[in-house]
């Protein structure tokens, strides 16, 4: 099992590896991550409908497990690239370029799953839940969306950090499970998950002929994804800054 200082020391090399990948490879891996998180969102939706919020929260960690174990690029986890950037292993420009490409890929993957599941009738009988979930997210006040985004990515980056401490699949799943369970249970906001939930709500409303005035591309992007993404960046970078200060900064 890797210690926290060993994980911190590994991040400069991890950062170099991530930014050295070709744009196509990065984009494809990011699309996969968006799909994995979206599929977890599908499962969590049914967990909420047929069980309760705890069941939905218990299912959702499958998304990050697929991201880490199968291998893909997730925007929220890549906020930890602040560590190699501060260590000058990569440039800020390289970090921002990675974030932009991964964000775009995550969006493509998540929207693809939203379109396929709604179009394929996966949510038959539970469209009201899909629409209500999206509408609630779109109606969040901007400060609430920002703060929930910060709290969410503190937990997500801790989940990534804890998974890196393990050397086997079982340990990685155990490490990431509880932080992800907590963020879903607490109702915090994850931009990549919302790239699924919000389009799914829009598609479901259109499929059912339901009028949902606050479910538009504008409210999705400006009302939710923008503040949640900013919050996720702040929360993720805060985790990276603390661990970099504690373990890598020269005394």
State what each model feature region is.
Residues 1-251:
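Alpha-helical transmembrane segments and their helix-helix packing motifs
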């Amino acid at each position: 099992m890797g210690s926290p200082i060993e994980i911190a020391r590994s991040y400069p090399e991890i950062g170099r590896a991530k930014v050295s990948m070709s744009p196509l490879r990065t984009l494809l891996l990011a699309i996969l991550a968006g799909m994995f998180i979206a599929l977890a969102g599908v499962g969590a939706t049914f967990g909420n409908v047929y069980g309760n919020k705890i069941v939905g929260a218990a299912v959702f960690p499958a998304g990050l497990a697929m991201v880490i174990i199968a291998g893909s690029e997730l925007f929220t986890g890549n906020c930890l690239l602040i560590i190699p950037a501060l260590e000058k292993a990569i440039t800020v420009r390289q970090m921002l370029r990675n974030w932009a490409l991964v964000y775009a890929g995550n969006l493509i993957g998540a929207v693809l799953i939203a379109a396929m599941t709604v179009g394929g009738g996966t949510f038959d009988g539970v469209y009201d839940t899909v629409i209500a979930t999206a509408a609630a997210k779109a109606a969040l006040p901007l400060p609430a969306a920002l703060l929930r985004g910060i709290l969410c990515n503190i937990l997500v980056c801790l989940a990534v950090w804890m998974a890196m401490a393990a050397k086997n699949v079982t340990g990685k799943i155990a490490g990431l499970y509880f932080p992800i369970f907590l963020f879903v249970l607490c109702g915090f906001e994850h931009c990549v998950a919302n790239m699924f939930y919000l389009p799914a709500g829009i598609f479901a409303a259109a499929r059912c002929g339901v009028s949902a005035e606050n479910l538009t591309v504008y409210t999705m992007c400006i009302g939710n994804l923008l503040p949640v993404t900013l919050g996720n960046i702040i929360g993720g970078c805060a985790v990276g800054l603390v661990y970099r200060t504690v373990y890598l900064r020269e005394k």
